[in-house]
């Protein structure tokens, strides 16, 4: 599997990209794929990457959003739902396999460090090949490599490109419990002009719904009634009142389409707050599924008919 990105989108004035670093992470690879030739600014956390954009220190941020093995990245969901709004304008999907790096002549391996998502994706490999090593969580895969250099850990599970940045020995490559694992990354920036619709787009929102019976069903019905295919649904606690959640919803289509705009209007009616997180081309190029009677022309025709009725032009 190769890096999947859509056709290049117009990034406007984006020239400085903050990313979840340090150097040698998968996120850096995604940032280079999405914004080749632009200045990359490594930061220590996902939240810091988004804060850098919000405070004007970068024009956009590249952050991981979901992995095919471990699911969503909670830190990204939480940070996108807080503070001032940012919107996704592009995405990339990277194949994920790892290298295990050690110090040259480092001896026995007692500790293996990496980001928790990475450790979870090589758990079986570690049990089979380094059964005596204790897994240790680090802030990122490359931070683990730095820890090995500093003598804090004996080995690090990293993106293969990390071996080009850090003077470490490659103990193993192509390490992965699931051979076709992949991670999706977003390029987000402050609200502004959106990418043009392509027919293979993804729209994302975060909904703070009213806490009552049937609320989630109402949100999903707003999409189903308009023939809109859901691609992801996750819930995260609001961290204010116990039992209250925000719903992160991805679905096919672009806000420029009448059916998608109609759905967003319906979602807004059912929510205490609805944050639009962007419409952008899908990296996998899968075109939207449109059911009979749910095409954009159908919505336009229905609106024209209703307007004629309102004006008394139809009996």
Locate predicted features.
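Domain-level signature for soluble enzymes in the chorismate/prephenate branch of the shikimate pathway
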Residues: 1-315
């Amino acid at each position: 599997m190769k890096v999947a990105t859509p056709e290049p989108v117009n990034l406007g004035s984006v020239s400085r990209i903050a990313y979840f670093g340090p150097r040698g992470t998968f996120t850096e690879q995604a940032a280079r794929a999405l914004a080749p030739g632009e200045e990359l600014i490594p930061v220590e956390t996902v939240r810091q990457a988004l804060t850098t954009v919000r405070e004007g220190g970068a024009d956009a941020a590249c952050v991981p959003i979901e992995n095919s093995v471990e699911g969503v990245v909670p830190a990204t969901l939480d940070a996108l739902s807080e503070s001032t709004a940012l919107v996704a304008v592009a995405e990339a999907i990277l194949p994920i396999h790892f290298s295990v790096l050690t110090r040259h002549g480092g001896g026995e391996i007692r500790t293996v460090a990496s980001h928790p998502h990475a450790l979870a994706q090589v758990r079986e490999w570690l049990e089979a090949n380094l059964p005596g090593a204790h897994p240790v969580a680090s802030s990122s895969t490359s931070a683990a490599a730095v820890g090995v250099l500093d003598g804090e850990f004996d080995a690090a599970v990293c993106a293969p490109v990390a071996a080009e940045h850090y003077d470490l020995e490659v103990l193993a490559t192509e390490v992965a419990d699931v051979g076709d694992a992949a991670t999706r990354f977003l390029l987000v920036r402050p609200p502004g002009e959106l990418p043009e619709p392509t027919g293979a787009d993804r729209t994302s929102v975060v909904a703070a719904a009213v806490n009552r019976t049937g609320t989630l069903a109402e949100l999903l019905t707003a999409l189903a009634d308009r023939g809109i295919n859901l691609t992801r649904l996750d819930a995260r606690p609001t961290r204010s009142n116990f039992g209250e959640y925000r719903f992160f919803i991805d679905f096919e289509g672009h806000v420029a389409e009448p059916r998608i705009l109609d759905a967003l209007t319906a979602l807004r009616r059912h929510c205490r707050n609805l944050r639009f997180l962007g419409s952008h081309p899908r990296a996998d190029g899968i075109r939207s599924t449109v059911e009979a009677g749910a095409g954009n022309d159908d919505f336009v025709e229905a609106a024209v008919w209703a307007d004629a009725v309102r004006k008394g032009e139809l009996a």
